[in-house]
């Protein structure tokens, strides 16, 4: 009986993936592609883009709250899946 209970607990942990953390891209527009693991499961991946002079800039990473859109021409995209901010 104890073995069955232990097996059910292990299977539950594996399928629920307790302690899951999100993996996000964190490179800027001019650097090679890199990723980071967000510190907690409540985090979003974000991608922020804007025009700086004549060049487009992109910033990526993890954030606990999705940044609000601002009227300064900055575009922000948030998501919660692994590497969804490419």
Curated annotation (Swiss-Prot):
The keyword Transcription does not apply. PROSITE patterns: SNAKE_TOXIN (PS00272). Residues 1-21 form the signal peptide. Expressed by the venom gland. It holds the Pfam family Toxin_cobra-type. Disulfide bonds join 24-45, 38-62, 66-78, 79-84. It is found in: Secreted. Keywords: Acetylcholine receptor inhibiting toxin, Disulfide bond, Ion channel impairing toxin, Neurotoxin, Postsynaptic neurotoxin, Secreted, Signal, Toxin. Its main location: secreted. GO terms for cellular component: extracellular region. InterPro entries: Snake_3FTx, Snake_toxin-like_sf, Snake_toxin_con_site, Toxin_cobra-type. Coiled coil: none annotated. One of its GO terms (molecular function) is toxin activity. Antagonist of muscle (alpha-1-beta-1-delta-epsilon/CHRNA1-CHRNB1-CHRND-CHRNE) and neuronal (alpha-7/CHRNA7, alpha-3-beta-2/CHRNA3-CHRNB2, alpha-4-beta-2/CHRNA4-CHRNB2) nicotinic acetylcholine receptors (nAChR). The highest affinity is for human alpha-7/CHRNA7 nAChRs (IC(50)=180 nM), compared to human alpha-1-beta-1-delta-epsilon/CHRNA1-CHRNB1-CHRND-CHRNE nAChR (IC(50)= 550 nM), alpha-3-beta-2/CHRNA3-CHRNB2 nAChR (IC(50)=500 nM), and alpha-4-beta-2/CHRNA4-CHRNB2 nAChR (IC(50)=2.6 uM). Homodimer; non-covalently linked. Belongs to the three-finger toxin family. Short-chain subfamily. Orphan group VIII (haditoxin) sub-subfamily. This is Haditoxin. It comes from Ophiophagus hannah.
């Amino acid at each position: 009986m104890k073995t069955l209970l232990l097996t059910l607990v292990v299977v539950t942990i594996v399928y629920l993936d307790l302690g899951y953390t999100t993996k996000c891209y964190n490179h800027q527009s001019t650097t090679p592609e890199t990723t980071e693991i967000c510190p907690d499961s409540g985090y979003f991946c974000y991608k922020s883009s804007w025009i700086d002079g004549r060049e487009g800039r992109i910033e990526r990473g993890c954030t606990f709250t999705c940044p609000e859109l601002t009227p300064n021409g900055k575009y922000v995209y948030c998501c919660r899946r692994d590497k969804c901010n490419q």
